[in-house]
């Protein structure tokens, strides 16, 4: 299953999840993430869909790099809540949440409908300029990064409202887990990851990729 098809399916499932009444009911409550309310978290999740159409229209002004290099350069992966980038993400997510749950869910669904028409016509070698970070990616690599965000933050939102995470397509979860395993191996070493997944008696306390 091509990454574009997988992303569209995952985005549609996520947009429907954002419309769950439990999300609206808990909008102002604390989320499972430190320093974020449920509304801000939901808005950040919605942004993994709504940011894609404008990204497709943006001019490419920087060099293209690989998906591996993208995550190596990204500063938000260090887990520092007080970092400039993580503080910025929380702020813009809180600002977006002011529009309310109905608007956020509606904008996500509108973006999905737009992308269903547009993505199939994009060239196989299409490149995009990231709205963050001074570099470009292939469209498929960019959509893979959005799949990771949908999976991780979809689970965060589900934990926040006490429900199961949205059922993302298996092909999408396979891609996400492949990326996370590679990131974890760079952080902790390949041997550590192998032990954690195969030898309980030698398993480390954490193999977190993020």
Describe the function of each predicted region.
Residues 1-16, 23-34, 54-84, 88-210:
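Structured surface interface patches that mediate subunit assembly and partner/cofactor docking
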Residues 17-20, 44:
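Conserved catalytic core of Hanks-type protein kinase domains
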Residues 32-45:
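N-terminal interaction modules that seed assembly of large macromolecular complexes
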Residues 43, 47, 145-148:
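DHp/HisKA dimerization-phosphoacceptor four-helix bundle of two-component histidine kinases
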Residues 46, 51-56:
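N-terminal amphipathic, basic helical "cap/leader" segment at the start of enzyme domains
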């Amino acid at each position: 299953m091509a990454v574009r098809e997988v992303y569209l399916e995952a985005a549609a499932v996520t947009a429907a999840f954002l419309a769950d009444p439990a999300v609206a009911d808990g909008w102002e409550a604390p989320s499972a993430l430190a320093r974020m309310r449920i509304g801000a978290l939901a808005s950040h999740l919605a942004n993994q869909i709504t940011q894609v159409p404008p990204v497709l229209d943006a001019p490419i002004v920087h060099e293209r790099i690989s998906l591996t290099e993208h995550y190596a350069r990204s500063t938000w992966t260090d887990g520092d809540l007080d970092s400039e980038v993580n503080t910025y993400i929380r702020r813009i997510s809180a600002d977006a949440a002011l529009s309310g749950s109905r608007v956020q869910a509606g904008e996500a669904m509108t973006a999905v409908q737009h992308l269903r028409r547009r993505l199939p016509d994009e060239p196989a070698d299409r490149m995009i300029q990231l709205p963050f970070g001074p570099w470009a990616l292939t469209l498929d690599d960019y959509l893979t990064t959005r799949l990771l965000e949908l999976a991780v933050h979809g689970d965060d939102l589900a934990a926040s409202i006490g429900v199961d995470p949205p059922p993302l397509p298996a092909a999408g979860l396979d891609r996400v887990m492949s990326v996370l395993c590679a990131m974890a191996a760079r952080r902790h070493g390949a041997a550590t990851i192998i032990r954690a997944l195969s030898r309980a008696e030698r398993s480390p306390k954490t193999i977190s990729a993020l």
